[in-house]
């Protein structure tokens, strides 16, 4: 059974964003503490690499299953159950000493994130009407960015005073914010009943017929973003060597540069939200995604030319703003085109592509760094990102012209149960309102496009 609420539920938006920001802060706090714990225990680079892989791989491998689960199970049940499980896992992490046990617990934690991230991302469009989604996305991204900025700072204070156990216990407490949000949110989706502000999608198909591979614009967005991230993602491995060794920057400078990208995402998300309201069609949104990806790549290319580390700060601020804009455009495009009943799967697929691209960038950047100096590697990453965008420009042009299932004049397959549930033969897989559209690994401080997207 489904019913429609005409007005957007802003208290739900703020509650979900606050819970997400708190957990992100705890995650970045724990990431710093765990890295220090492994280093202090004498673990080498292999253990740290295993930690990063454990935090990322489940988000990629479990995406199809996790997205389906988030679409079919009541969101309140998922947030409360998984939030409690993640809090317990973080508490065990505070007591774990052996690197293998730490890596295993991190992998379990990431399994929970594979479910909660698409669950929260799919809830956001259900909380507001379509015209309010850009603003809601900006609010959510602001909370995530503030959490990601505050976590490492808090870690620097707590680890020096109390060691690693207190930060990990604090991270466990932050997951209780998900539990509270799950209990208090009026908006619910999944399960047998949906209580939502139903956003009219342009899904190019019914809930049973929609597939990512059949939606050319969505497919282009996912693939182009993943490939650009793979191209420039290696800077997260190279950056510390470039700043500290090539540019002779201080640890303080390195910290400022690292924070600049995330800081730039704050105004970038809000600027994109204002612009998104003027973009009346999906083609304009996918072009916005390409423009922002190109801007990120250009800033990376320019970074290879700077004579001093301090000049990286303004470049990273601009790149972060473009990254924030890309997140808003991608969230809005997904909410517009994907039926409500399948949005968690779509967000999970997008998140898996982002994480897969990040993993590829880490591996390639780390491998090349053993043989090539940092400066030419950063320049190569920027050039590669720009080339990828240029390659996808004609692909987008063809995708815009190509009819999608659900476009006028394209016959829809009528499922046997077309008159039941959300799917209808003549419209989106959700009822229309009576009146009157965010995803990244918790352990990675990555600041390439897609990071800090909540699926956000």
Each model region followed by its residue ranges:
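Alpha-helical transmembrane-bundle signature of multi-pass membrane transport and export proteins
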Residues: 1-415, 427, 455
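Short, intrinsically disordered terminal tails adjacent to the first/last structured region
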Residues: 1-3, 408-456
